[in-house]
A protein has these predicted regions:
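C-terminal folded domains that constitute the principal catalytic or ligand-binding module
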Residues: 174-176
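Glycine-rich anion-binding loop/nest that anchors nucleotide
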Residues: 32, 161-162, 178
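Mg2+-dependent endonuclease catalytic cores in nucleic-acid-processing enzymes, primarily RNase H-like
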Residues: 2-158
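Short, solvent-exposed helix-loop connector elements
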Residues: 159-171
Length: 180
């Protein structure tokens, strides 16, 4: 059995980014206060949970599970709230017990992909704009390819219309869109 080598990489990465302060445009210093780590990736789920339990940044890192919520699916707003659950706009943090016993976030991937794409469409400088830093397109080419690896399809079901995101057949990878 081959040992998974990325935990050392994720430890270095979280150490570099979560262990420092960042200066905003107005000069104020801020820290990253929440970092979600994809726990839906095959056999690495248990490794992600273990890392989140044992990390020096255990109060900041949290496993996450993206869920496809299509038009015919039950939307997050209709889930029955249980004691200890935390509920947000198209995300929830279920109360946990058992083997993994680590708080984790479950979120509606279709909603959040639409959210990111809507922000990228806002004009530069306007309220709600999401932009890439700098003017050297090559620095952002891979990110742009991942962000455009899927397309939205408006779908109706259960009396509502939602965007459902589908992979473009000619594109191979969408990992960075999934992790935004």
């Amino acid at each position: 059995m081959r040992r998974c080598r990325w935990p050392a990489g994720i430890e270095r990465l979280t150490g570099q980014y979560l262990g420092r302060e960042w200066r905003r445009d107005d000069g104020a210093l801020v820290r990253i206060d929440r970092c979600l780590i994809d726990a839906n990736w095959g056999t690495s789920t248990d490794v992600v949970y273990q890392f989140c339990r044992q990390s020096a940044h255990a109060g900041v890192v949290m496993p996450s599970h993206g869920r496809f919520v299509g038009a015919s699916s039950q939307p997050f707003s209709e889930y029955r709230r249980r004691q200890g659950d935390r509920i947000g706009h198209n995300w929830r943090m279920p109360n946990v017990h058992g083997k993994r016993a680590v708080r984790h976030v479950v979120f509606d991937t279709n909603f959040w992909k639409s959210f990111v794409h809507a922000r990228l469409a806002v004009a530069m400088g306007d309220r709600g704009c999401l932009s890439l830093f700098g003017d050297q397109a090559e620095q952002h080419r891979l990110l742009a390819e991942h962000l455009t690896a899927e397309y939205r399809v408006k779908t109706e079901g259960r009396g509502r219309t939602v965007d459902e995101w589908k992979m473009r057949p000619e594109r191979g990878e969408n990992h960075w869109l999934d992790c935004l």
